[in-house]
Amino acid sequence: MNFHNIRLIARYESKYICRNPVFLGIALSGLIIIFIMQNLLQGKEHAGAWFLVSLSSAVPFINAYLFMILQSVLVILATSEWRTSEKRADTLEALRVHPFNNLVYITGKTLGVGIVLLVLNLLSMLLAAGINLFASDAPFDGLLYLFYGVTLSFPAMLFLTGL
């Protein structure tokens, strides 16, 4: 397998996904909804239940849980857009006749979707860390964000993308 071709296809796919206004709108509105929900559930002024702020793992866990829901919607949207874009003419003419096999092509496209989802996940974790530090009474532990990213968000992304 040629990793240069995989990187090229992944970069092309991630740019294509980020330029899609429907995907971008749903992703940004989903991040805003997650931010508002977390602020309402775990903020200082709106804390609904004590168990949502008593543990240092509460804020990163709720963030990972809400992001997994958003991630499932985004993967469905990205794969449906993938199929419709390939049916339309002139969207992938530069790559349609390709000097690489289909495994490289599918790996690159899946990696492109994964890169976009990982960036959105990092942005969601940064927003949750901001809530945790500045707007919540919950204790902060930065390693828990990494833990829930590795044990919840990343495996969910692998499962949803079909790897």
Residue spans for each PLM region:
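Helix-loop-helix units of permease transmembrane domains in multi-pass membrane transporters
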Residues: 80-115
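Hydrophobic, small-residue-rich alpha-helical packing segments that form membrane-like cores
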Residues: 10, 14, 96-99, 135-136, ...
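Aromatic- and glycine-rich beta-strand/loop motifs that create alpha-glucan
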Residues: 1-30
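Cytoplasmic juxtamembrane interface segments
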Residues: 1-11, 83-93, 159-163
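Alpha-helical membrane-interface segments at transmembrane helix boundaries
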Residues: 15-18, 60, 84, 148
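Membrane-helix interface segments
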Residues: 22, 101-102, 139
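Secretory targeting signals
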Residues: 28, 34-77, 107-163
